[in-house]
Amino acid sequence: MLSFIYWAFSDTFFNWLFPFSSTGKGPWITVEGVAPKYTEPYVSAMYKSKTCLDYEVDSQMSPHKVPTYHGLSLDVKADPKTGHFQAKLPFNGGGWCKWKINQAFVSVSYTDVSHLVKDAVNEGGDGTGLTAFINNAAKTDDKETVTLNTLDYRPVIYPILEMSEGFPKRLFVRGEVGTCFFQLRLTPGAEWRIIYKPRLDETKIPKITITNGKGEWVEYPDGRIETGTQTVDFRYIK
């Protein structure tokens, strides 16, 4: 009974009554781009609440309050002819917890790789793309590119073929980094945009080979071979 009373008057209960909503909670961040042929886009975001808090125990076993988070994934479809896609992420998620956007994610991944290697499978998952830390969101380090109101990212990406002994051949797309990080600062009243237009170059396919006990190596399109590694060095692709 006491646990029910506690729940009924907690943030969890009121968040259940007045949940996150992505409808009509402008202003909006417009996300647009072009997904290369044989790929599909993904757009999602993480929202943070400083109203609804949770407890966390530190290394000294002392409890302290921390913010809570809510994830939002959008159903985004690219135009089958042009690859163009567009979506809108709400800045506010509303609700009892007063959600505000903290991070935005945009990426592309393969849907079909049979045109490159017939017996390979596509990786699926999040593919390659960008993460935008919004305003004062906690960053991974100090190396993020800082942009104001509009983030425009147009990398060259490549297919990577992974041949691991005992597993099917695997093809996935990558840029120089799996995810590029940005700090996106938003000015009230301005137009907010995230643009992601990768160019897929399928003329160059690095190959990763992983064996059981016979080593591992990466072979580059020009014939160069780097042994003892599974990491592709993009300096050798261009």
Can you annotate each of these PLM segments?
Residues 13-30, 37, 57, 231-237:
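Beta-strand-rich domain onsets/edges
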Residues 19-20, 83-84, 164-168:
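Short, intrinsically disordered, charge-biased short linear motifs at domain edges
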